[in-house]
Amino acid sequence: MKRCLLLLLLLFCRVAPAQVDPAPAEQFVRQYAGHYRVSPELVAALIDVESRWNPRALSSKGAMGLMQLMPATARRFGAFNPFDVEQNIAAGTRYVTALMWEFHGDLRLVAAAYYAGDHGIARELLNYHNPDVVAYVLAVRRQFMIRKYGPMRSQRRFTP
């Protein structure tokens, strides 16, 4: 009986999500957002949605770290260890900056491209019909509005 309880406890500890304190990473968000002149609220909103501030997050598709960078994107923007908080935020913020330039500051397209890949969104522009992409854009927008204006402002209706 003790052995069974111990196994259940160990299994629960492995499955239960870890509580992550975002405070240490938020300083890097402010630092790199300021350096690359991109909204720190946007970067933080992407992290909220992508990993919920878990620096060890690993997706089923292989995206890694706080900003869920794919290996090629991480290398392209200078994160050689995507699980390193500072490298991940620096590279992710550089990527967001590149997307801001590519999509002329349109936050909907930036969020869609961050989720679905910049090449697919560049071809279709606002004609993204994938419900997962639309849901992602809305989730990022909601977190952005909460961070920028507080929870009440985020309740306004938004069309992607």
Identify the function of each model-found stretch:
Residues 2-8:
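Sec-dependent signal peptide recognition
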Residues 19-160:
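Catalytic glycan-binding domains that act on GlcNAc-containing polysaccharides
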